[in-house]
Regions:
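Phosphate-binding site recognition
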Residues: 1-447
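Active-site metal-binding core of divalent-cation-utilizing nuclease and nuclease-like domains
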Residues: 163-168, 465-491
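Structural motif
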Residues: 173, 493-497, 529
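Mg2+/Mn2+-dependent nuclease catalytic core
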Residues: 193-198, 501-518
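Metal-dependent nuclease catalytic cores in nucleic-acid-processing enzymes
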Residues: 202-210, 362-370, 458-463, 511-531
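Acidic-basic catalytic patches of nuclease active cores, encompassing PD-(D/E)XK
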Residues: 437-471
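Conserved catalytic cores of phosphodiester-cleaving nucleases, focusing on short active-site segments
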Residues: 457, 481-485, 493-501, 515
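Domain-level recognition of nuclease-like catalytic cores that cleave nucleotide substrates
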Residues: 520, 526-550
Length: 550
């Protein structure tokens, strides 16, 4: 066993299985039943890409633990779902697996590059990639004599694998994690990228090295690079965030899986909170939750943003500061809850060839900053911010940009909060009416209280970020107040908001008083502002009355 050939070292899937009584564990081993059907078929080349922290590495480790001769998988899988499938024993630990983690290869190459003494023919990352695999194959008791006979050198991975396959009549399983590292970390090195993709094309083309593999599995963040609008590895069946296919349930947590997680006595967070914070990736009609964030929220009993994407955050900053007309406004609108239609038809699946806003949104979907839903045209997608976690990340990033305070939406939000503080009901009514009449509010939902609540929350979104938390339908006094803005620090007033339809703002204010919504907060806050907002379905006018309680 080595680090690449039949690795038996640290395996995140095995560690998770062993700790399943104390950690969140969702059995995704049904995925193995899917891959078992692909063996030695024209579907044996499979690429699945997803954003960071979507379980890609755990899944790759699961494949390795199941197929590799380097593991004793019976004890790992015997109580999991795959053990109930007819194909379970047929493939269990029967294959020589070549497992490549490109992050590890890149790190080792970095150390190699600093050495004075170099290996002949190993000059760049692609050479080192080949050399690392060949070195382990040469050190194997099974393959060493064959490779010695063929006088295999330090590079030439294709001829190495062909020699083994032809002489020993054996096939490998090839698993590559972070396949797209060359396109992300070396995004401006076009020569290295072309050398890398040429190597993979030769390995996996039908008249090349494809016969060396019973199954090949690539995973990463970016879809397979396109050249001249065609996939560079067109023999692969590819499934990504823009075209997820049938593998959506195996990456991320589904609604049913979340329901089981919250049933555990160890789970102290609610299904609704998990949904608000981490769901929203609708992949092929399946609601998907970010699995890494769910696990952290459950283990820490707190739903906050656990998004870890420092390098991709930098990429987001670069993308929203491009000169494409309207991109900043679109990002602000997305954060506020609107949707944007875009085309992914000409996206080249890299981080450099960004030609227009369509490519920006396509890349942001692949990175996980946006969700997308399908339309009748397979290339036309509808982008949206998927959940509170991503919304919080995007808001923090946007607020750091030098153009932030110049945006009309931000000015409007500041003016709305200022008007509430100054008890200026006329201005509040005007701003809410502007939002209500904007494209952000669906005509189908225009005349319901939900849309009015949305208008106020959207209007106050940016101006209340630092000083307020908000609650809807909060139990207070003798009933539930529609909307509460509770100050994080004591210097700001508490804001209670009640809505009416075809009534009056005076009625809304009277309800706050007669139902004594404020009593719950008496003693906590010295200043309480109450806001009554009415909308007339006949006149389409908004009315607002604001008072400060003594």
């Amino acid at each position: 066993m080595g680090n690449i050939l039949n690795p038996g070292n640290d395996n995140s899937f095995i560690n998770l299985v062993k700790a399943r009584d104390t950690r969140v564990f969702v059995d995704k081993t049904d995925f193995l039943e899917k891959t078992n059907t692909l063996f030695n078929t024209d579907g044996k080349l499979l690429a699945v890409t997803r954003p960071r922290r979507f379980g890609k590495t755990v899944t790759a480790h699961m494949l390795s633990a199941y197929y590799s001769k380097g593991y004793a998988g019976q004890n790992i899988f015997d109580k999991l779902e795959i053990a109930n499938r007819a194909s379970f024993a047929e493939h269990l630990n029967k294959y020589d697996v070549i497992y490549i983690d490109m992050n590890t290869i890149d790190g080792l190459f970095d150390g190699y590059s600093n050495k004075k003494q170099k290996v002949e023919g190993v000059n760049d990352l692609v050479d080192y990639f080949e050399y690392s695999i060949i070195k382990e194959l040469k050190s194997s008791d099974i393959f060493s004599k064959c490779l010695e006979k063929h006088q295999i050198e330090n590079t030439g991975l294709l001829e190495t694998l062909l020699a083994i396959t032809q002489d020993l009549n054996t096939k490998f399983i090839f698993i590559m994690d972070e396949w797209d590292l060359v396109y992300r970390e070396y995004c401006n090195d076009e020569a290295l990228q072309k050398k890398f993709i040429k190597l993979l094309k030769n390995l996996f083309k039908a008249d090349g090295g494809q016969d060396c593999f019973a199954l090949a599995y690539l995973t990463g963040i970016l879809p397979i690079k396109k050249y001249n609008s065609q996939s560079a590895l067109n023999d692969f069946d590819e499934y990504n965030m823009l075209s997820p296919g049938d593998y959506a349930p195996y990456f991320g947590f589904t609604e049913d899986e979340i329901a089981k997680i919250v049933e555990s006595p160890n789970c102290k967070v609610s299904h609704q909170d998990l949904k608000e914070w981490y769901e929203g990736y609708k992949i092929k009609g399946v609601d998907i939750y970010n699995p890494n964030s769910v696990c952290k929220a459950v283990s820490r009993s707190e739903c906050i943003s656990y998004w870890s994407g420092t390098s991709s955050n930098e990429e987001f900053v670069r993308l929203i500061n491009t000169d494409f007309k309207g991109i900043k406004e679109d990002i602000i609108n997305l954060i506020e809850g609107e949707q944007v239609t875009f085309s992914c038809a000409n996206f080249q699946n890299d981080m450099v060839t960004i030609k227009d806003k369509n490519d920006v949104f396509s890349l942001l979907v692949c990175l996980g900053y946006l969700g997308c839903s399908d339309t009748k045209n397979k290339y036309r997608k509808v982008a949206y911010v998927p959940n509170a976690e991503i919304k919080a990340v995007l808001m923090d990033i946007v607020r750091e940009q030098n153009w932030y305070e110049r945006m009309e939406t931000i000015k409007r939000s500041d003016n709305l909060l200022k008007a509430i503080m100054e008890l200026d009901g006329t201005t509040v009514a005007r701003v809410i009416q502007e939002i209500h009449n904007s494209s952000a509010v669906s005509l189908l939902d225009y005349n319901d209280e939900e849309s009015l609540t949305y208008c106020v929350m959207t209007g106050l979104l940016w101006s209340t970020l630092d000083d307020y938390s908000y609650h809807r339908e909060d139990q207070a006094g003798k009933g539930r107040v529609d909307l509460v803005y509770e100050p994080i620090t004591g210097k700001m007033p508490l804001i209670l908001i009640e809505f009416k339809y075809d009534g009056s703002a005076e009625e809304a204010i009277a309800q706050i008083k007669t139902q004594e919504y404020f009593k719950r907060y008496t003693g906590q806050y010295r200043n309480i502002i109450i806001v009554g907002i009415n909308y007339s379905t006949k006149t389409k006018d908004h009315q607002c009355l604001i008072e400060k309680l003594d």
